[in-house]
Structures are given as structure tokens and as C-alpha cells.
Design a protein with these regions (language model features):
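Core AdoMet radical
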Residues: 1-20, 24-70, 81-97
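Auxiliary Fe-S-binding modules of radical SAM enzymes
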Residues: 67, 73-152
Length: 152
């Protein structure tokens, strides 16, 4: 593997990671981050423990599209995750992303000093009981303007 390139390996199939790692993986490589995607609490509780059991120098997880509030404190407390990313549903989806869910993740990551990136609002964003329909071109910009990434 090229040591001059950083690789980000992302999957929702956490249970297949271990068997697909190279034979010389050992405790991971300095330039490879393993990332598992989840959508909600159920999937986080299903997939994150699997990633925790896999040796890797760098780990992250993404909640996208976020479909419900997620409490991930017990995973952050392991000190194995360097980054959490979150995004609302986009493309043809219309399931809402709630500001309160994002704020909760932000606060959890801040408490454990884990980088949090709110990468996009999704098509439907709800804040203060008001629903916003946000065109794809503005979803990332609106997420950045929210001030909910950590550190900001």
C-alpha cells in the first residue's frame, strides 16, 4: 500500500471488514482509517462494537443519513474513535434531520474530545419546529454555518 496516500475505508458492512483486511494488517497501518456507517441507534449498537474489536490505528464512524437521535457515549468513551461524521438524507430522500439530534452528537463528541463533522443538513432539516427544504447545493453550506462541527 502506498505510504504517501491516506486511505479512508468506509462501509456499512462492519461484519465483513476483518476477513477483508490484508494478511500483514496486524494492528493497522498509519495511513488507513476504518469507518463504519450507521443510520440510527440500532445500527450503531450493531456495527460499532464490531469495529471496536478490529485492530486499527485510526477509526471513525458516520451517521448518515441520520434517521433518529443516537447516543454514542459508550463508544466515544473507548477512545478508539478519532472522528464522527453526520449527514441528513439527500438525493431523493425526504426523511427529516432534526437540529436536536445533531446538537446531541456535537455535545457527546465535545465531551469526549472527538472531532465531529456535520457534513450536510439533508433535504429536510427541522429546527425549532420549523421545517426547511434545502436544495442539495446548500446542504453542506448550511451545515457549516450551523456551528455544530467540533472543533469549530
Amino acid at each position: 500500500i502506498r505510504s504517501d496516500v491516506n486511505f479512508w475505508i468506509q462501509t456499512k458492512r462492519a461484519d465483513s471488514i476483518q476477513q477483508r483486511l490484508p494478511v500483514d494488517w496486524n494492528y493497522g497501518w498509519e495511513n488507513v482509517t476504518l469507518c463504519v456507517t450507521t443510520e440510527n441507534q440500532r445500527r450503531a449498537d450493531e456495527r460499532l462494537p464490531i469495529l471496536l474489536d478490529i485492530p486499527a490505528k485510526h477509526k471513525a464512524f458516520m451517521i448518515a443519513p441520520i434517521l433518529s437521535e443516537a447516543h454514542v457515549e459508550k463508544y466515544l468513551a473507548t477512545n478508539q474513535f478519532e472522528q464522527v461524521l453526520c449527514d441528513g438524507e439527500n438525493y431523493d430522500g425526504d426523511r427529516p434531520c432534526y437540529y436536536e439530534w445533531i446538537k446531541s452528537l456535537h455535545d457527546q463528541c465535545k465531551e469526549y474530545d472527538v472531532t465531529f463533522n456535520f457534513t450536510g443538513t439533508g433535504n429536510v432539516f427541522v429546527k425549532d419546529k420549523k421545517t426547511y427544504h434545502i436544495p442539495k447545493a446548500y446542504q453542506r453550506v448550511q451545515a457549516q454555518r450551523s456551528g455544530l462541527s467540533y472543533p469549530s
